[in-house]
């Protein structure tokens, strides 16, 4: 017997590939001709970032840059800062995907080593890890209506990553040093911390407002070290096709190539600090919706053969933003006399084995007991127990300070916000097809059935191809499962 049925198409963007790619690069760098020779290296760091990530011909094409920052002493014991920018590209096979597939990537720096060849040339080895995420549209057919049948329906609020867009922000700002400062000779090192603070979504566009903090260590006119801090706001309107007010957005900002220059002036002030360069912004949008799912079904007074499809999604979803604080001890090998420069940046954030793991990179330049300038950096992790997973996240450092707690120990106090779109991973078996294999002969008007405790009324009704509502009414059952062992009456159809 052919049944009249109607079908619905359930669609979702599945994470079809999540891959970490470790990359090691070696470079030989030479300072610009106008810079002094390298006598002693104090600080050599690098950070890598993505400039584009696209899918073509079953491959993900990733392009990016690595900025190398070098602080060194010249022959006159003056501190000099310079930087180098190198390109990189990676091609990753992702298999067969549809034209709806999209991807994005993030970078986590691992380490940077150097070896001096001579006073004009230095070998630099940089290592970092790219995390690639590829999403593709998956759909499955689900029976929505069927004649003379009972369908087990459930409405669930589900969510998936809807899109991911990478865009570039150009920045250019100037800051005047206080008039009572002793001027500025040259920049020694700096750190820029940027984070999104607000997003507003309209049709096909997202407005991202962000805050930037600039920390600069510089030498003054007496060739002594001094510090300056500045904060400013930036904003960007990003075109994101398909996004609307029903979506949520996680905006992740990453430093690109940034340059900080010192400028002396004849005016009555201490000088000017200029910052210019670029940032890269990844907007990951998440869409949630109420979805009607049919888990099971049967035809009254007939045996059926059912087919099911697996549907993976995130359920019980919400945008979670919470504030935290941590105290992290920074252990040194040498005794510390004075902290010259300290900065804290988010390094990585992930959820593994029901734990939220947030890593911070702490960078410290200090004067030791032997009156030498030292630089060290360490990665510190903070763990929290969680019961959910996130589709996307961002860490925002709101403040940090430090205390010298021992001759070789610094205690760093960090306040930060975690913002993520969280939920529970779910996998459902969806009723995709149902066919009659045999029509049953009519049952007696009533049939006795010895039901067990916790047995589902649905399973009993399906077993006898009877009407579940009639069974509940006949036996005064209000719940979906039996609370005790019970003899019940099964109405015939």
List each model region and its residues.
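Membrane-lipid interaction segments
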Residues: 2-443
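Primarily a LysM-type cell-wall glycan-binding module
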Residues: 436-473, 478-493
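Short acidic DE-rich linear segments
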Residues: 1-3, 492-493
């Amino acid at each position: 017997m052919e049944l009249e049925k109607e079908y619905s198409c359930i669609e979702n963007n599945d994470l079809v590939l999540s891959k970490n790619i470790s990359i090691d690069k070696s470079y030989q760098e030479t300072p610009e001709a106008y810079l002094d020779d390298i006598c002693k290296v104090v600080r050599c760091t690098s950070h890598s970032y993505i400039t584009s990530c696209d899918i073509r011909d079953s491959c993900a094409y990733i392009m990016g840059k690595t900025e190398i920052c070098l602080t060194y002493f010249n022959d006159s014991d003056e501190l000099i800062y310079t930087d180098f920018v190198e390109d990189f590209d990676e091609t990753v096979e992702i298999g067969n995907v549809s034209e709806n597939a999209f991807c994005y990537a993030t970078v986590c720096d691992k380490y940077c080593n150097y070896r001096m060849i001579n006073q004009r040339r230095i070998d630099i080895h940089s290592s970092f890890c790219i995390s690639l995420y590829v999403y593709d549209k998956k759909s499955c057919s689900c029976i929505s209506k069927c004649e003379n049948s009972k369908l087990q329906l459930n409405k669930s609020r589900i969510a998936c990553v809807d899109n991911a867009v990478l865009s570039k922000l150009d920045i250019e700002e100037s800051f005047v040093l206080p008039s009572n400062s002793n001027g500025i000779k040259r920049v020694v090192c700096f750190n820029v911390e940027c984070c999104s603070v607000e997003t507003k979504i309209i049709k096909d566009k997202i407005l991202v407002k962000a805050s930037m903090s600039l920390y600069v260590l510089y030498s003054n006119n007496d060739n002594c070290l001094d510090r300056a801090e500045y904060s400013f706001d930036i904003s960007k309107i990003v075109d994101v096709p398909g996004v609307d007010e029903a979506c949520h957005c996680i905006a992740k900002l990453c430093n690109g190539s940034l340059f900080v220059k010192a400028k002396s002036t004849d005016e009555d002030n201490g000088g000017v600090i200029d910052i210019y360069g670029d940032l890269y912004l990844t907007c990951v949008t998440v869409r949630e919706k109420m979805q009607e799912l049919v888990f099971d079904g049967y035809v009254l007074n007939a045996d059926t053969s059912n087919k099911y499809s697996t549907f993976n999604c995130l359920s019980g979803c919400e945008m979670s933003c919470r504030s935290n604080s941590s105290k992290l001890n920074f252990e040194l090998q040498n005794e510390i006399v004075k902290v010259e420069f300290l900065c804290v940046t988010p390094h990585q954030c992930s959820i593994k084995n029901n734990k939220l793991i947030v890593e911070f990179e702490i960078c410290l330049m200090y004067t030791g007991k032997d009156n030498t300038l030292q630089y060290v950096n360490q990665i510190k992790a903070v763990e929290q127990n969680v019961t959910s997973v996130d589709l996307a996240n961002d860490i925002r450092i709101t403040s940090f300070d430090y205390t010298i707690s021992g001759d070789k120990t610094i205690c760093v106090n960090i306040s930060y916000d975690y913002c993520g779109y969280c939920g529970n991973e779910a996998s459902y078996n969806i009723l995709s097809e149902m066919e009659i294999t045999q029509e049953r002969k009519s049952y007696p008007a009533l049939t006795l059935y010895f039901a067990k405790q916790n047995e589902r009324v649905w399973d009993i009704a399906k077993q006898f191809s009877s009407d579940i509502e009639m069974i509940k009414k006949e036996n005064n059952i209000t719940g979906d499962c039996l609370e005790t062992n019970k003899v019940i009456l099964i109405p015939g159809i």
